[in-house]
């Protein structure tokens, strides 16, 4: 719980000589979450309370999400600090890696991993699979299909390649294929802009972006600390033993609350439930969380079976009142302004 973590945040601030902000999107099976634009306003609330400072360290755990939201988070954080550090306890994949590229340095534990940043598209025009859901279209999957035809099957004449592309468009809507091309170009441009604060050498930047956007081969590929530092050339730091122990304690406490590895099963729920799926926390800003709240109702069927109904009553962000201090100091970089929360503070 936040009441246990706030002491760890304070110790981390001392250990890194920085202001700590934690952003966690759960990958719990059946109750996962992603980086999304709706978190931006909550970042602003926390950063306004932190105020302009020399250094901000973002503790980040995520499997990815909206790439534009990731870019906006980096740009917003940079408005409040001179140096941006990202601390990766475990996973910062896809859009999480985009955020990491925008930092001046990335602190990775020995178990931490980054990942490719080639986007997967989720649109209403995506192909439908037998269970009725929409199948995400990966930029690299489309590229791999076309390269397989050219490189492995040795198809080079334009007429045959056109036929292969037409066959692809029978399964993937042409507008989705167009969006694939646009997204790849956008990701490359975004990565080039963000990485400037971490890597100066143009050739090294091109190498990093090319690998993350296409040459890794699979969106599931993971990049450990050694590869990120020695082979890619990112500005990666190893935490000290003291720093690592604090990071690990923080991760374990968050995992105990969000249950990353425990699938959410309706068959195991009876009655009301509340599941926290995202966290955004700081010492002065308290704890904001994205929650899904509902009721599981069991009803007997004529054939003797039991039907399980999941009635979701609320899904969105809430503020944890128990994380509030009676008085919070807001600073504009010069003089601290102290105010007391009113009874009308939003929950």
Protein language model annotation of sequence segments:
Residues 1-347:
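Terminal-region recognition feature
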